[in-house]
Amino acid sequence: MNAPESVQAKPRKRYDAGVMKYKEMGYWDGDYEPKDTDLLALFRITPQDGVDPVEAAAAVAGESSTATWTVVWTDRLTACDMYRAKAYRVDPVPNNPEQFFCYVAYDLSLFEEGSIANLTASIIGNVFSFKPIKAARLEDMRFPVAYVKTFAGPSTGIIVERERLDKFGRPLLGATTKPKLGLSGRNYGRVVYEGLKGGLDFMKDDENINSQPFMHWRDRFLFVMDAVNKASAATGEVKGSYLNVTAGTMEEMYRRAEFAKSLGSVIIMIDLIVGWTCIQSMSNWCRQNDMILHLHRAGHGTYTRQKNHGVSFRVIAKWLRLAGVDHMHTGTAVGKLEGDPLTVQGYYNVCRDAYTHADLSRGLFFDQDWASLRKVMPVASGGIHAGQMHQLISLFGDDVVLQFGGGTIGHPQGIQAGATANRVALEAMVLARNEGRDILNEGPEILRDAARWCGPLRAALDTWGDISFNYTPTDTSDFAPTASVA
C-alpha cells in the first residue's frame, strides 16, 4: 500500500496554523528507503472505522516522534525533516481485514545512546492511547549497529557462564522453590539442598519472594547459600541458586546484591517489573562484580499476550538483551504458560543469534545484526516435567535452562528424587540425540528405557505421563499455522 508520491503539503502551507493530516505534515512517505542507520519499528494497527490506514500509520509515526495535534511554529526552529519519523509502508494483516502492519523509520539522532528508558518513552510512550486507532501493537524492531554498540549487553553471556559452571553439551537444569510463599528460611534452604543434591544445576527464587514476614531476605540468602555450598561439596559440581534482590528502592537492591556476593553467590535475580533503568543499573553492577543476572519476566503478560494491542515479547526480549540480562524467561511452548511453538522459537532466536534473520513464520520481520553483543541464556519454565524432555530439547537445543519447579518439588518420592528424575531424563535424551536417534519421535521410548534403571524417573513418568496443557495460544504467527510439538 505504498503511495506513488509524497502527499506532504507544500512547504509554506505545511506551517500554516491549524490542524492538518499527519500524512500531509510529512509523517508518511511511501517512497522512503530506510537507511542502515535508521531504527525501524513494525506496528500492528487497527484504525477506527473510516480512518484511512495510511493516515493512521502517519499518526503513529508522528505521535512517536515529533508531532502534536496541531501545527506548531517552533517546528521551524528544528531540522524537522530529519527528526520526523516516517511511516513508509502499510500492509494488510493476513486473514484480518481490520488490521494493518505499519512500518516506521526513525532517525538515530532521536534517541539517547544506551538508554532503553528513552527508547521506550518515544516508541510506546504515547501512541497506544491515540483515539483514531482502536488498538496498536509493537510487533518487532530493528536497531542499527551504531545504536546496538552503545549498549554493553549481557554482563556474562552464555559462553562465559558455561565456562564458570564447567557444564557443556547439554541444557542446564533448574527448579523454582515451591511453595513460592510461606516457607521459613530453614525449610527453604532444605528444598534448595535437596534439589541441587539430586542433580540440578540451579535452584531459584520465584518472582514474588522478596522479604516478607514469614521469611526475611537475609535469612533466605544465608540458608540458601549454605545449601548451595553443601550440595556443591557433596556432588563435586558447581551449583547456584538465583537470589531475588528485587526490592522497593535501588539502594535496597544494591544492598541485597552486595550481601549475596559476600556469601559467594554466582547469580542474582530481578523481576521485569522493576523497570528499564533499574534493569540496566543492575546489569552494570553484575558486570563490575562478575555476577550472572537472571531476569524473571513478571508482569509481561499484561501487555504481551493480546495479539491486537500491546508489545510483543520478541520486542521485550530485544530490549532485555540490549539492557544486559544474562538469563530471561522466554516460554516453553509445551508448559502451562502462553506460547505458540514457532513464536516462542523466535524469542529464542532473539536471545541467542549473532545475526537474526527475518523469518515471518516466527514473527521476525527484520534482519538484526547484534554487533557481537553477548548472547542471553533463555529459560524455559512453567508447567514442564521429565516426560516432555524430548520435546523441549527438540524445540530449543542445548543453550537453555530447563526449569522444573512442580516437576521436581512435586515428585512422589521427594525433592531429591524429582531432581534425579529430571537429570536422568536429560542425560538419556542428550545421549540418544548424540547417537543420531530421532528424539522427537522416539522420545517416549527413550524415557521408558531409561526409567527401567531409574526408579525416580519411572515414578515421574507414572505420575505425570504425557500431561500437557493443550490450549490454543492467543499470540500466534500470522504467516504460518500453529505447529504441533508432539
From Swiss-Prot:
PTM: The disulfide bond which can form between Cys-278 in the large chain dimeric partners within the hexadecamer appears to be associated with oxidative stress and protein turnover.
Cofactor binding: number and manner: Binds 1 Mg(2+) ion per subunit.
Listed EC numbers: 4.1.1.39
Top-level EC class as recorded in UniProt: lyase
Cofactor(s) annotated in UniProt: Mg(2+)
Annotated residues for binding of substrate: 126, 176, 180, 297, 329, 381
Induction description: Total RuBisCO activity (both chromosome and plasmid-derived enzyme) is high under lithoautotrophic growth conditions, intermediate when grown on fructose and poor when grown on pyruvate.
GO biological process, one term: reductive pentose-phosphate cycle
Sites of N6-carboxylysine modification: 204
Sites annotated Transition state stabilizer: 336
Superkingdom of the source species: Bacteria
Residues that hold Mg(2+) according to the record: 204, 206-207
Disulfide bonds: none
Signal peptide: none
Active-site residue numbers: 178, 296
Keyword Amino-acid biosynthesis: no
Keywords: Calvin cycle, Carbon dioxide fixation, Disulfide bond, Lyase, Magnesium, Metal-binding, Monooxygenase, Oxidoreductase
Pfam families in alphabetical order: RuBisCO_large (PF00016), RuBisCO_large_N (PF02788)
Catalytic activity: 2 (2R)-3-phosphoglycerate + 2 H(+) = D-ribulose 1,5-bisphosphate + CO2 + H2O; D-ribulose 1,5-bisphosphate + O2 = 2-phosphoglycolate + (2R)-3-phosphoglycerate + 2 H(+)
Gene Ontology MF annotations: magnesium ion binding; monooxygenase activity; ribulose-bisphosphate carboxylase activity
Comment field (misc): The basic functional RuBisCO is composed of a large chain homodimer in a 'head-to-tail' conformation. In form I RuBisCO this homodimer is arranged in a barrel-like tetramer with the small subunits forming a tetrameric 'cap' on each end of the 'barrel'.
Its biological purpose: RuBisCO catalyzes two reactions: the carboxylation of D-ribulose 1,5-bisphosphate, the primary event in carbon dioxide fixation, as well as the oxidative fragmentation of the pentose substrate. Both reactions occur simultaneously and in competition at the same active site.
Subunit structure: Heterohexadecamer of 8 large chains and 8 small chains; disulfide-linked. The disulfide link is formed within the large subunit homodimers.
UniProt record similarity statement: Belongs to the RuBisCO large chain family. Type I subfamily.
Protein name: Ribulose bisphosphate carboxylase large chain, chromosomal
Species: Cupriavidus necator (strain ATCC 17699 / DSM 428 / KCTC 22496 / NCIMB 10442 / H16 / Stanier 337) (Ralstonia eutropha)
